[in-house]
């Protein structure tokens, strides 16, 4: 028996067969070639991910406090929340009087966000769609991409998203983006985590999970793989994430090229400065105001 967090698995022949298949995996996958991205638009995956990936109200409160202090969250402010998920940020901003549109690729996430908005009596427009093809023009006072998947895109896609964000902002509008720094992914390189559970992104069943992390310093790309072995049948479900991280000057250059000028940069949501030890960047960028 293998215990983890109170979960016990019988060591059966199917489980051992599944582990053998995991042992034969490719040593180091090539990002965006051997691994793509998570199937966000798959209804089943969307439901499983939504159920297992949530953040605390404490995080949300801190983020909203920062947005208010920066003058970006005021009654009547038109805000686009990119990768809105189940509406954590969208609903919090709507409660503070903002006029919010949330966009996400996951059908279960959008459905859950709509239900939560109705239950709370809040008017929020939730759109199931791909941020890489969104088409708004000068429609928002602010755009947020918080706890999203900006780095889980190719550089080409990320450049296109920034262009579309800039187009969606009114002149003088603000963009808020948080991303993990390359050093965050570098620290994870080679890490492996084995754990036993009953509920993860492949569904609800007794399972043994291996999560692996990879980082490639020459390109600043990263990858994560999850092998989820069904303890009952030995079936192995594999999920992969590829990503492209950016040094801070590089990210600021991308924003500038898209038509947004970085105005403030922090090392976290506590408003601390970026240091050599920072594992994330929080960037506020402004679209140029209209010229007389």
Please annotate each region the language model reported.
Residues 83-87:
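Class I SAM-dependent methyltransferase "Motif I" SAM/SAH-binding loop
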Residues 88-133:
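Class I SAM-dependent methyltransferase SAM/SAH-binding core
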Residues 159-171:
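A short glycine-rich, Lys/Arg-flanked "PGG" loop and its adjoining helix->strand segment in the class I
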Residues 172-179:
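Conserved beta-strand signature within the Rossmann-like core of class I S-adenosyl-L-methionine
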Residues 179-252:
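SAM-dependent methyltransferase
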Residues 242-292:
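C-terminal lobe and adjacent flexible extensions of AdoMet/dcAdoMet transferase-like proteins
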